[in-house]
Amino acid sequence: MSERLSITPLGPYIGAQISGADLTRPLSDNQFEQLYHAVLRHHVVFLRDQAITPQQQRALAQRFGELHIHPVYPHAEGVDEIIVLDTHNDNPPDNDNWHTDVTFIETPPAGAILAAKELPSTGGVIRSGPAVLRPMRRSLFPSASC
């Protein structure tokens, strides 16, 4: 596998698709530096079709810094730093409105590494920026012109 990652912006302001990395194996220092700078520049990055274990996900996350153990959600077996979000008809999401993660602690996490194991055929949209903030401003300040 090449040392060089392919980074393709998904829009003018946020998001990039990254290929050329195999997250089932540790990234080289050079590859991690490319990934790190892509996260800083694009804020949200996608590394698709990565069949990683919770242990491999934790190892990657640890390269970014200290990890947080969530006090409420269930953890992956043997990996306390990884939470499992399992939603379906009998277990609907409890946070499907706008929210930020773990902002109630003194030093909130700088980010999150998500590994989807099963996705719905529709829905599940993650929105950020103005698409989220406009409706939130309207609900907080109904008399303002947002």
Tell what function each PLM region has.
Residues 2-146:
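Non-heme Fe(II) oxygenase catalytic core, chiefly the N-lobe of the double-stranded beta-helix
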